């Protein structure tokens, strides 16, 4: 048995290919059942996200293993092997172990250190667990990978710094205000970036969120999810004074928030400070706003500078994380190699126990029939010794007959003959 990881990801295949090789949640049971019907496959986990599709398998090693698994993948997705062959990567043994640990820890992600992948790996594991498609080796590997990912998060700073615009905007707000729990936030727009910002802010339990958008309908579903109030863009002027933090990201060709609007809001607020974060290009907030006292304006360029600084910090943390993964993968392989002896030891003990049981039973019968106890015990010891050393003796004789001194020495070591 060997462990194998194969797949495609954002580094080896464009989205046009990745989307053709995905496994939907609805089809996962069917895919796992089909995979386990392959003669060489003893257990499997399928990880399928927007950036990667990977199979983690325990398999019987054979020369045509790659061809068989490529054929299965292509048949399942109705593709030609030529479509995927150049994009597929293969990891065996320790490389497969290390790859999964890197994936779970966010070290192989498009955004270095992103935490979402760990949840996706756990979900894939749970699917295989539910479908009873795990081998004992795979189960141990995934459980170990989860603990490695946790260790990487705990012992390094790989997840501490913002490397997305949305996360950077929220991090900036937390740096300036420390706690967000008593603050009111106005979000302008309802696109993907604002969605991410809203979810980050909800996690930090802001007191109140307002989402301003050109149409209420577009913003309503997001507002329902994060518990926000919805207003239209023309209502911003009247509500701006309510906000301590304003984060804007629309596709408007002209500014939505002007200097005069902010001046009126500051007057109403009696000059309590306001933080403006403008993520939009073109800008949603007039640059002159940043010149007002108690109005602090940051643009998308300011956020990019923060992101670049934070990415450098993550890359430094990744070096430490890679060291953890290397150490833990070696520890796992030590355990895995030891498992190779478990079945042999179990069989050997079972055989010895069977011999002991049979010969003890015969000895007890002899004693019950009146035989001399001392003679029975001596005979039992003699026969038991001969039975137990018979197979090793034959192996020693064969090794000597073959002139195989290396095997002869290995047998001597196994039998403890050179121990003093």
UniProtKB/Swiss-Prot annotation:
Keywords: NADP, Oxidoreductase, Porphyrin biosynthesis. GO terms for molecular function: glutamyl-tRNA reductase activity; NADP binding. NADP(+) binds at residues 189-194. InterPro entries: 4pyrrol_synth_GluRdtase (IPR000343), 4pyrrol_synth_GluRdtase_dimer (IPR015896), 4pyrrol_synth_GluRdtase_N (IPR015895), GluRdtase_CS (IPR018214), GluRdtase_dimer_dom_sf (IPR036453), GluRdtase_N_sf (IPR036343), NAD(P)-bd_dom_sf (IPR036291), Shikm_DH/Glu-tRNA_Rdtase (IPR006151). During catalysis, the active site Cys acts as a nucleophile attacking the alpha-carbonyl group of tRNA-bound glutamate with the formation of a thioester intermediate between enzyme and glutamate, and the concomitant release of tRNA(Glu). The thioester intermediate is finally reduced by direct hydride transfer from NADPH, to form the product GSA. Belongs to the glutamyl-tRNA reductase family. Catalyzes the NADPH-dependent reduction of glutamyl-tRNA(Glu) to glutamate 1-semialdehyde (GSA). This is Glutamyl-tRNA reductase.
